[in-house]
Amino acid sequence: MPDICDSNKLNHRFRGYYPVVIDVETAGFNANTDALLEIAVTLLKMNDDGILVLDKTVHFHIEPFEGANLEPEALAFNGIDPTNPLRGAVSEKEAFLEIFKTVKKGQKASDCHRSIIVAHNAAFDLSFVNKAIERNDLKRSPFHPFASFDTATLAGLSIGHTVLAKACKMAGIDFDNKEAHSALYDTERTAELFCHIVNRWKALGGWPLATPEQSAIENTDEKIES
């Protein structure tokens, strides 16, 4: 169990996992058939006081993979035109190789042994990330293939709401609905929400965990008071 000093280090906070916040924008809900169109990745770090904060963000517009399905309803919802040359889109492979490089660098600097995806309704984002990695036969992914931190679940527990915009506002985080459904904007708001939840839990005394000796003393005090 980490001591009070170690608990302020990122590599001791999440069992050696390096949290990486991700948001994707897609051309549908099916990771097997629908195009991945945009991805943003926000790295996190802990300051000297053990407060989790945003570090840096990388962002890519993605070219639809060959034969990808483009659902008109999805494109109308996120406002993305995959054919627009001004997007500056790159291939899935190019984007993920750069993401791997950036994440591994941050993971190493934090002395963590693996990265774990943080996302709002994380199963959706994780499915598209995993399928893109598989489709491009990319090796040595830094990400855990199935474990994740879902901020929808965490926000529902800690704040009382699962919708990103409403959870952010309830947490005191500015959220502009006009900017929503951009991977870049949503990723950074999700990162702020995750940091808020983690830091609030620490402020309430939930972290670091009490040692067995401390727990024994607290239990004894409770018995005396009762």
From Swiss-Prot:
The source's domain of life comes to Bacteria
Write down the CDD domains for this protein, in alphabetical order: RNaseT
Sequence positions that bind Mg(2+) 1: 23
How does the cofactor attach, per the note?
Binds two Mg(2+) per subunit. The active form of the enzyme binds two Mg(2+) ions in its active site. The first Mg(2+) forms only one salt bridge with the protein.
Protein EC: 3.1.13.-
Cofactor requirements of the protein: Mg(2+)
Pfam families in alphabetical order:
RNase_T
Entry annotation: catalytic residues = 181
Q: Which UniProt keywords apply?
A: Exonuclease, Hydrolase, Magnesium, Metal-binding, Nuclease, tRNA processing
Protein's UniProt keywords contain Transcription regulation: no
Any one GO MF annotation of this record: nucleic acid binding
Answer yes or no on keyword Metal-binding: yes
Q: Where is this site: Important for substrate binding and specificity?
A: 29, 77, 124, 146
> Residues in domain Exonuclease?
20-194
> SMART domains, from UniProt?
EXOIII (SM00479)
- List of residues binding Mg(2+) 2: 23, 25, 181, 186
Q: Which GO terms describe its cellular component?
A: cytosol
What PANTHER family does the entry give?
A: DNA POLYMERASE III SUBUNIT EPSILON, RIBONUCLEASE T
Function, as annotated: Trims short 3' overhangs of a variety of RNA species, leaving a one or two nucleotide 3' overhang. Responsible for the end-turnover of tRNA: specifically removes the terminal AMP residue from uncharged tRNA (tRNA-C-C-A). Also appears to be involved in tRNA biosynthesis.
Instruction: Tell me how this protein assembles.
Output: Homodimer.
HAMAP family attached to this UniProt entry: RNase_T
Task: Return the similarity comment.
Answer: Belongs to the RNase T family.
Tell me what this protein is called. Ribonuclease T
Q: Name the lineage.
A: Bacteria, Pseudomonadati, Pseudomonadota, Gammaproteobacteria, Alteromonadales
